[in-house]
Amino acid sequence: MRATPPRDDTYPSNENFKEKYPMSYVPIVIEQTSRGERAYDIYSRLLKERIIFVCGPIEDHMANLITAQLLFLEAENPEKDIYMYINSPGGVVTAGLAIYDTMQYIKPKVATLCIGQACSMGSFLLCGGEKGMRYSLPHSRVMIHQPSGGYRGQATDIEIHAQETLKIKKILNSLYSKHTGQDVKHVEKSMERDNFMSPEEAKKFGIIDKIITHRDIKLLKDKEQGQ
């Protein structure tokens, strides 16, 4: 029997995404040091500034990379905030939960910021950021819905996987309720079908705390001085 893990979206797999949109054109930045020049890919350079990107479909390989970055930044400075930028259509539930659990596990606060879209597990990670530090740019889109999956094989095995998907659904509803402040029944009803939201609607629902149009330099300086 072959069965796909529970997914919360209907988007293509990460392999198809990579084939269609090759990631080989990542910019390289040059930094001058006392020992000469040092080259970084742009994401590694931003990691030095404690910025993590969750971009594209969420699957196991991405989850491993994101959790490794979170753990590295905690080891480097457990008192300093981490900034997670999200532009994702969603993906595999268990991969998203691995990232979420690590966000809750580590000591640094994790601020989340939606750029472009935060759909399915992307919206789950967005609302799982530190309370008061969950942001969205003004023209981003947020979407929540219940998990889905495709299975085949013997009827008994299909039933087992269906029950597992229902358990995952219950867990996600409970966690969305925890982070948004919404009643579980309201969350379940809101996630029955694809539910697209503007940043204003996402804020009202409790997924984000603030819509930002410009970088708040004073806020960042105040946070740095408080650390």
From Swiss-Prot:
Catalytic activity: Hydrolysis of proteins to small peptides in the presence of ATP and magnesium. alpha-casein is the usual test substrate. In the absence of ATP, only oligopeptides shorter than five residues are hydrolyzed (such as succinyl-Leu-Tyr-|-NHMec, and Leu-Tyr-Leu-|-Tyr-Trp, in which cleavage of the -Tyr-|-Leu- and -Tyr-|-Trp bonds also occurs)
UniProtKB keywords: Cytoplasm, Hydrolase, Protease, Serine protease
UniProt GO cellular component terms: cytoplasm; endopeptidase Clp complex
Entries under Pfam families matching the protein: CLP_protease
Residues at the active site: 120, 145
Role: Cleaves peptides in various proteins in a process that requires ATP hydrolysis. Has a chymotrypsin-like activity. Plays a major role in the degradation of misfolded proteins.
PANTHER family, per the entry: ATP-DEPENDENT CLP PROTEASE PROTEOLYTIC SUBUNIT (PTHR10381:SF70)
Protein name: ATP-dependent Clp protease proteolytic subunit
Species lineage: Bacteria, Pseudomonadati, Pseudomonadota, Alphaproteobacteria, Rickettsiales
